């Protein structure tokens, strides 16, 4: 039932004021044993996952980031009582002794948030936060970028990947959560009349890499101000 509730409503019941969320997270992390190993995010359905807490790491940097992602998830993910009932009906059909009786009592109580049972806590010692699955996957990269931002030195982070792999989503999150500017390669298309005849067979053959280098990478690497001139594909102008 807890899994059903979490996959339906996400971390809504754990969200609140950012300061409270952060204090609770820091307190929980500080109590974890140092040898508690990191685990990959655990998908729980409906676009959500459990991000497990580890016993080591720089939580003074990671905890605020995780708190922000939790609050973003709570604001963006919305479930309904009907969605929860669909999950409970599926659970009721499982051949588990006592499930039907337990769910009957749970429904009469109004289906409140569910806590892990003592037996589950003893067996698994759960410590995690529920995030959107994408946010759980992005977290290591976001944390690495946060470390660069904290260094106080100019830094350039390149995000590469296949079409539709989440590059823009990660970049947007960095822009929302970190003190940085995001430059999209979509703004640096090469005008069609300047492309090679076989540009489709050339990696980045449709990109104006020379302009991107001179207007963005060189000044950004030197800590200087960049001049962003997006290319408008419709008008063919900058």
Model-based region annotation:
Residues 167:
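Conserved lysine of the Walker
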Residues 124-150:
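N-terminal pre-Walker A segment at the start of P-loop NTPase domains
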Residues 1-120:
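Long, basic/Gly/Ser/Thr-rich N-terminal segments
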Residues 162:
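P-loop (Walker A) phosphate-binding loop of NTP-binding proteins
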Residues 181-238:
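Conserved nucleotide-sensing/catalytic segment adjacent to the nucleotide-binding pocket
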Residues 156-158:
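Short hydrophobic/aromatic beta-strand immediately N-terminal to the Walker A/P-loop
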